[in-house]
Structure formats: C-alpha cells, structure tokens
Amino acid sequence: MEALGARGALAGFLRALCVLGCLLGRATAPPSPVIKFPGDVAPKTDKELAVQYLNTFYGCPKDSCNLFVLKDTLKKMQKFFGLPQTGELDQSTIETMRKPRCGNPDVANYNFFPRKPKWDKNQITYRIIGYTPDLDPETVDDAFARAFQVWSNVTPLRFSRIHDGEADIMINFGRWEHGDGYPFDGKDGLLAHAFAPGTGVGGDSHFDDDELWTLGEGQVVRVKYGNADGEYCKFPFLFNGKEYTSCTDTGRSDGFLWCSTTYNFEKDGKYGFCPHEALFTMGGNADGQPCKFPFRFQGTSYSSCTTEGRTDGYRWCGTTEDYDRDKKYGFCPETAMSTIGGNSEGAPCVFPFTFLGNKYESCTSAGRSDGKMWCATSTNYDDDRKWGFCPDQGYSLFLVAAHEFGHAMGLEHSQDPGALMAPIYTYTKNFRLSQDDIKGIQELYGASPDAGTDAGTGPTPTLGPVTPEICTQDIVFDGIAQIRGEIFFFKDRFIWRTVTPGDKPMGPLLVATFWPELPEKIDAVYEAPQEEKAVFFAGNEYWVYSASTLERGYPKPLTSLGLPPDVQRVDAAFNWSKNKKTYIFAGDKFWRYNEVKKKMDPGFPRLIADAWNAIPDHLDAVVDLQGSGHSYFFKGTYYLKLENQSLKSVKVGSIKTDWLGC
C-alpha cells in the first residue's frame, strides 16, 4: 500500500476513522450517566411534541390547542395513520410523531392542495441551485433526474434541467430558517418540503442539509485518483484478511483515507482516495483546488475547515494561504469519518477518545438517553467537550426527492402507507410507484402517451402495487408470528399487528419500518423466545434481528442452519413451548432445530403427515401463542388449532373472522 500515490501532503491529519455501523466502544466500560451535551437540542416532551406536530400538520392552533381541541385533532391524526383513535398520547401515537417525515401537512388519500393547483403545461423545467456536501454533485444530479422520471413514466409530464435563470422548480438545500418562512428542525424530524405548482415559489423543493443524505444504505463515497477514479467505495471490503466498513488509512504512512472499489482488494487491487479537503473542495470560486492550511481569514489563522463568516453552517476553507488577500475559497467535502450535528461543525471522529474517564475505540451511545451513536472530535471529551453524531444509513435523496416532486406536481399526502406520497419516510430498496400514487397523478395530468392503451371497455389495468385490505380481500399471509408479545401478520411489504387475536390489528404498516433490511416478501418468520430474537426466511437465506437491529453477518444461507442444499425456501417455522425446539417446515417435510446447541437434531427431516395430526403439507405459518397451551397452523384463509400436550386438533376456523376481527 505504500506504493499508492496521493497528491500533496496532509500534515496533522487525524488518522482515526468513524466506523459506519457505529459499534459500541469498550464493552467493559460501566454504564454511564445521561448527560447534557453542549450544542445538543433537548428532546421535546410528549405534550410539546404533540402540540407542535398537530399544529404543523393538522392545523391545530398552537395558542389554542387546548385539551379538548387537542383530543379531537389527535383522533384525526390517528385515523390518518391507521392507529387506534383513542385521542390519547399513547405509545404508538408518540412513536409515529417521532418518525422522520416530509414537512408538508397531511391530507387523506391522494387529495391535492387547496384549489387543486397543477401545471398548465407538460414541459417543466428545474434548476439545482445548491448541493449537499454529503454526496458528490454527479450523484445528486442523478438522484434528482431519477426522481423526476418516477412521475414522467406515468404522465405526459417531461422534465428538463436548466443551469441559469428562473426554472419552474428551484431545488436547494438549507438548514433551519432558509428563507421561505418554513424552517427545518435539525437532524431527523422534518426532511424536506415542497410548494404546490404556481408562480414564485410554486414547485420549489427544499431539503434539510442537517440530514445525512445518501442513497438509503449508508454513506455514498465516490473516490478520487488512485486507479479507480470516479468509482464508488465498496463496503465492506477486504484488505489483509480484515473487513473494513469505512474508509481507512491502514497501510499508508501519509494519513490519506482510502477504500477499495471491489470487495477483495488483495485480489483486484482497485482503490481510490476518499473525499477530503486536502484533495479537493466543492463549489466556491477555486475550481476544486484543495484547502491550504493554515490560511488567514479576517486576520485569524485557521488550520482546518471552518464555518466562520457564514450563517448557513457550511464548512469552508481558503485555497491559498491568505484568503483576505486572494479571496479564493471552496466548501469542504464530507468524508466517511465526518460527524453530523453536535458542536464540532462536521469535524471527524478521533479514536480513541476519553469520556467520563473511560476510553472508547469507536462510536458509542454512552451518556445519551436516545441511543444515538456519537463520538468525540478530540482525544478527550472531558477536557474539550467537542462531539458529533456518527454517520448512519442516512436518508435516500432519490426517495425523498421523488416524494417532494410529487408535491411540486400538485399531490398532497396519501393515507395509503404503501404510497410514495405517504408522509413518513421509509427506505424501500426496490422502489415501485404504487397504484395510489399513479391514480392521484393521472387524475391531474392523465396517463403517459408512451404507455399502451386498450381501446376496449372495462376497468383500467392496475399499473402499480396495491396495498392489501385484510377484511375485503381473501389474503394468504406470507408469515404470522408472535414477536415481543405482539402478533404480526406479513403480506408482501406490509404488516398488521395486534396483541389479542380477534381484535382488528393495527395497519397496514411497512415491514421496513421495523426491519429495514428485509426483502419485500418473506416466506416464514418466528421468534426464538430464549434470546428474544426474530428470525425471518426469504428464498434460500435467513435474517436474525435483535429488536430492529440486524445481527452482524446476516443474511446467511439456509445451509448454515443445517438444512440441505436442495431446500431453496421455507414454508413456515415456529418455536414450540412444549420442548423449546424450533420446527422448520418445507413442502411435506419438517426439521427440528436446537436453539441452545445451534444445530439440527438428528433423525430429521420427517414427513409432516407422520408426526402432526391432521396438519397439511405446504403450510403458510405456524404460531405457538405464549401461555395458551395451543399452536396454530395456517394454510390459505383457514387455520387449525392444536392442543400442545395431546397433539389433538381441536378447531378449524377462519383467519379473517377469528384472528383479524373482520
């Protein structure tokens, strides 16, 4: 690696990196007290949050949102999100209010802004005024172009970019109050907002630059120089037998951070340098020249990027030694080790660092009540009190932009949780525009002339996925499981949840809200109660979660459980309270798995018909309800109830009637 070349030198460069995924620091450190971090925004109380939320999104007047008005407005909000309409600030309501979302108000279905504004032309122009330092300009340009294409694919609308002058849709990034009277709120919370079609600010779309903008799966790092210039880092990558999940300076003596652009660097040798102000700057007037440290600004010497002289919080530097004389500057790019928020102006993590007398080698949640991962930006937080949040998965600029551009076309928020125009952000890996979105936009502009039309009569064909309705449709669920005391019903990318069978479950909700890494459709699911972990099966792989956190190393192949290679999918699985063993069903066979020994029991597989009384082959799901003494086997729209001790079948019933409260 010493042979890798780099432009210039980086004196005093901090070599520690903030590892993506942010594992806890020293496991041996005792629990730390919760402290107040300087520069941190104190979380709102539930009541403060509710008043602000209902005022912003449901029109409850902030100065007169008293208990009676609050209760009535709260029921409207709960109805919109499919929550129990209690009028109380219960846990599910507060959880919904705290989720990241669009800053526009909520209106049911695919309704439009007041007076249903729309563009009176099909040729729409847009202009990107500013960029986020989180992504390189090419990635931002591509994300916005793909977001517009979401709508042009299903309408006659056509979008073209201009680089000067006034466009129909002006796109920019900003922080807090950014000039339109609708301030953002720092990291998380409000992600973006857009104005309805019209003159002036009509159609304009703004994105909160206190968020970490990615493509939804962690920082997107495009390398410079090396032998893979312009390609993207591949995380994790393998170097000297070790996996790296972020840029590293390992193997170098100059402190420059690098990454491999393929998984196996030792095999492929493809690498580049990660963005850093010593390599290049963005914007400004220096044509991408790197920072020059130290540089002078208003008589003061700076040895790192600064926000001094700016009101927008963006980090910049001089590209000559004297800015006062030369007036040459550029904005500092975000690196794979930059922090977010806090009080360090995006400075990188420094490892190890000392916090309350303990040493941490990586990001930690110590000292915080919200579980957010953070790091110090000096070697000793106790002395310097400088810190920031560690990078997480971030928010998909493409998905958020596609949503906001829907507003810019005239669409309001949808009550359909499967719609792009639903107000709450949920990352979707293989995005498809829903039928609700298509119906809404085509009500305004009509269908795309490029789509084939049927001259005959009959219903309009469904173009996008439709959110299922459990009581009006005969749904065959992909999986059913009791997880942390709640019963979850899975169908495609949706779930419904309830505590008591027979009560109408809450939902539909998106699976990705709870388990974001899962594919759009699962085959089976069960909870391993001994460890309180949820296990999901899809195709020839399985996933293991602790709460909503995917265990390291997953997904894994079914063969690692001890299933034979010819088993390419699982029908159902459950942990039986009678013997604490897990049963896995596929076709007409089943296997028994020992959760303690982590291996299959000998003597399996066996035929279902030989061991289970009246249980059919090719099951859909199995659940052993905690404390009930019964297990339930689901197939199609019916279930069979089995008495655990005697193995007698005691009931056959309708899922819709007995489980869904229809």
Curated annotation (Swiss-Prot):
Signal peptide range: 1-29
Chain segments carrying region Collagenase-like 2: 397-467
Cofactor(s) required for function per UniProt: Ca(2+); Zn(2+)
Keyword Disulfide bond: yes
Location of the motif Cysteine switch: 100-107
The protein's Enzyme Commission number: 3.4.24.24
Main localization (coarse): secreted
Name of the top EC class for this enzyme: hydrolase
Annotated stretches, region: Collagenase-like 1: 110-221
InterPro entries cross-referenced by the UniProt entry: FN_type2_dom, FN_type2_sf, Hemopexin-like_dom, Hemopexin-like_dom_sf, Hemopexin-like_repeat, Hemopexin_CS, Kringle-like, M10A_MMP
Proregion positions: 30-109
Keywords: Angiogenesis, Autocatalytic cleavage, Calcium, Collagen degradation, Disulfide bond, Extracellular matrix, Glycoprotein, Hydrolase, Membrane, Metal-binding, Metalloprotease, Nucleus, Phosphoprotein, Protease, Repeat, Secreted, Signal, Zinc, Zymogen
Residues engaged in binding Ca(2+) 1: D134, D209, E211
Fibronectin type-II domain location: 228-276, 286-334, 344-392
Presence of the UniProt keyword Transport in the record: no
A single GO molecular function term of this UniProt record: zinc ion binding
Disulfide bonds: C233-C259, C247-C274, C291-C317, C305-C332, C349-C375, C363-C390, C471-C662
Positions that bind Zn(2+) 1: C102, H403, H407, H413
A GO term from the CC aspect: extracellular matrix
Residues carrying a glycan: N575, N644
Residues at which Ca(2+) 4 binds: D478, D523, D571, D620
Family per similarity comment: Belongs to the peptidase M10A family.
UniProt subunit comment: Interacts (via the C-terminal hemopexin-like domains-containing region) with the integrin alpha-V/beta-3; the interaction promotes vascular invasion in angiogenic vessels and melamoma cells. Interacts (via the C-terminal PEX domain) with TIMP2 (via the C-terminal); the interaction inhibits the degradation activity. Interacts with GSK3B.
Entry function: Ubiquitinous metalloproteinase that is involved in diverse functions such as remodeling of the vasculature, angiogenesis, tissue repair, tumor invasion, inflammation, and atherosclerotic plaque rupture. As well as degrading extracellular matrix proteins, can also act on several nonmatrix proteins such as big endothelial 1 and beta-type CGRP promoting vasoconstriction. Also cleaves KISS at a Gly-|-Leu bond. Appears to have a role in myocardial cell death pathways. Contributes to myocardial oxidative stress by regulating the activity of GSK3beta. Cleaves GSK3beta in vitro.
Name of the protein this chain belongs to: 72 kDa type IV collagenase
Organism annotation: Oryctolagus cuniculus (Rabbit)
